[in-house]
A protein has these predicted regions:
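Charged catalytic carboxylate motif
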Residues: 29, 90, 119-122
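Thiol/disulfide oxidoreductase modules built on the thioredoxin-like
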Residues: 103, 108-114
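Bacterial N-terminal signal peptides that target proteins for export
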Residues: 1-11
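Short, exposed beta-strand-loop hairpins at the edges of beta-sheets
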Residues: 112-130
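Periplasmic/extracellular electron-transfer cofactor-ligation site
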Residues: 25-85, 93-103, 129-133
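Sec/Tat signal peptide C-region and signal peptidase I cleavage site
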Residues: 17-23
Length: 133
């Protein structure tokens, strides 16, 4: 019984630490790391849709909701219809492995994901600084 209690406590601590690490990304590093995303996504004033939608204000935005982007996959549209929102945790999962979330997404086919949790946290921290336009 004691082993299970210790395991449970360790699991809670690990979850708390991972959430803290996610929230504490470095925006400067994130801006540099976003170059990988910039092949398909733009941010900032005048951002356009390229291979993927522009990402202004993406944190907190409903999935598949950029009006002038027409290449959403069926899976992404379904998420949007279900009210799925791009919060930090969902963005982290998506950037880590798009194919695991939505196999039919163009991003899942073209981008393998970023395995490094710190780099993902940095990108998300940077995206949080970009307001909707």
């Amino acid at each position: 019984m004691r082993t299970f209690q210790l395991f449970g406590l360790a699991a809670v601590a690990l979850f708390a630490l991972s959430a803290t690490a996610l929230a504490q990304g470095d925006t400067t590093k994130g801006k540099a790391a976003f170059a990988k995303c910039g092949l398909c996504h733009q941010v900032g004033p005048g951002a356009k849709t390229l291979g993927g939608p522009e990402l202004n204000g993406v944190v907190g935005r409903k999935a598949a909701s950029v009006a002038n982007y027409s290449m959403y996959s069926a899976g992404m549209k379904k998420l949007g219809e279900q009210g799925f929102v791009w919060d930090e945790q969902n963005l982290d999962k998506w950037i880590a492995d798009p194919k695991a979330m939505i196999p039919d997404s163009p991003m899942a086919l073209a981008f393998p994901g970023i395995p490094d949790a710190g780099e993902r946290a940095d990108i998300i921290a940077y995206l949080k600084t970009i307001p909707a336009q």
